[in-house]
């Protein structure tokens, strides 16, 4: 018998490694990759090594002060957006905290300032871990763990 955690259509999660806490996220089974709002990403050299300097906005701070993170491990990938346009985006690996557990996640960096949710969790992350119940919300944030068994 197998079981997966039930997740709602939206939630609130933490990205502790990059100090972004209590971010509202949309669970998006239509998106393959997960993405996060990043208003600026710049490649920099530190001691001769290329790194990616990212400028995130943290909605937890009422003044929306900059959250700057430098990634050693990053890449670019081609992503097709919901409007069908392909673009190259930076991609980073970090951890997301949901249901009291840390999960590895790959996030593409996108300009989502005009979107309701700064973070989308896509199928690549969700598969084999979660089942979506669109009638529910904030199950992880409220620490309500339900299982779907099959």
Residue ranges of model-derived segments:
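Pepsin/retropepsin-fold aspartyl endopeptidases
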Residues: 1-150
């Amino acid at each position: 018998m197998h079981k997966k955690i039930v997740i709602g259509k939206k939630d609130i999660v933490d990205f502790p490694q990059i100090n972004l806490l209590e971010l509202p996220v949309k669970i998006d089974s239509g998106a393959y990759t997960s993405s996060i709002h990043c208003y600026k990403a710049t490649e920099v050299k530190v001691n001769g090594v290329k790194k990616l300097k990212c400028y995130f906005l943290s909605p937890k701070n009422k003044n929306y002060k900059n959250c700057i993170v430098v990634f050693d491990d990053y890449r670019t990938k081609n992503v097709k957006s919901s409007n069908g346009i392909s673009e190259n985006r930076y991609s980073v690996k970090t951890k997301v905290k949901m249901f009291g557990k840390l999960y590895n996640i790959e996030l593409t960096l996108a300009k989502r300032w005009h979107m309701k949710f700064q973070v989308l969790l896509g199928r690549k992350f969700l598969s084999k871990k979660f089942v979506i119940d669109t009638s529910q919300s904030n199950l992880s944030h409220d620490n309500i763990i339900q299982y779907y068994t099959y």
